[in-house]
From Swiss-Prot:
Ca(2+) binds at Y54, G56, G58, D75. Belongs to the phospholipase A2 family. The gene is Pla2g10. This is Group 10 secretory phospholipase A2. InterPro entries: PLipase_A2, PLipase_A2_Asp_AS, PLipase_A2_dom, PLipase_A2_dom_sf, PLipase_A2_His_AS. It comes from Rattus norvegicus (Rat).
Length: 151
């Protein structure tokens, strides 16, 4: 049973066909962040739902590995967007997936541009990482209280 769960989490994990991933126009809210990850990444977006100290909702402590650092920087990017008056978890923006590349826009405003760049950066960052099963479902109680400062 655990093996089946891991295969679902780490496999292609998408209901989108290859043709759809290559040339589909998306608009996103928080739930559609998975689409940008699916466009670029070698893993299912579900593989990051509860990984390390930062992948998933919230986050604190020292990031555990390169994947966790990607999620940490994404949290920082969302914080900066929020400071600029955007609502990262609710705001929608247009983008395309073409040949496993994210194409942001055309943006109607600065928030759309900022949020697409946050998600694009995360997707490319995660695509270049090695996955460590030991950080999947990592207990948050093992994450330190203090977090690094966002730049």
């Amino acid at each position: 049973m655990l093996l089946l769960l891991l295969l679902l989490l780490l496999g292609p994990g998408s209901c989108l066909s290859e043709a759809t991933r290559r040339s589909h126009v998306y608009k996103r809210g928080l739930l559609e962040l998975a689409g940008t990850l699916d466009c670029v990444g070698p893993r299912s977006p579900m593989a990051y739902m509860n990984y390390g100290c930062y992948c998933g909702l919230g986050g604190h402590g020292e990031p555990r590995d390169a994947i966790d650092w990607c999620c940490y920087y994404h949290d920082c990017c969302y914080s900066q967007a929020q400071d600029a008056g955007c609502s990262p978890k609710l705001y929608r923006y247009p983008w395309k997936c073409m040949d496993h590349r994210i194409l942001c826009g055309p943006a109607e405003n600065k928030c759309q541009e900022l949020l697409c760049r946050c998600d694009e950066t995360l997707a490319y960052c995660l695509a270049d990482t090695e996955y460590h099963l030991k950080y999947l479902f990592f207990p948050s109680v093992l994450c330190e209280k203090d977090s690094p400062k966002c730049n």
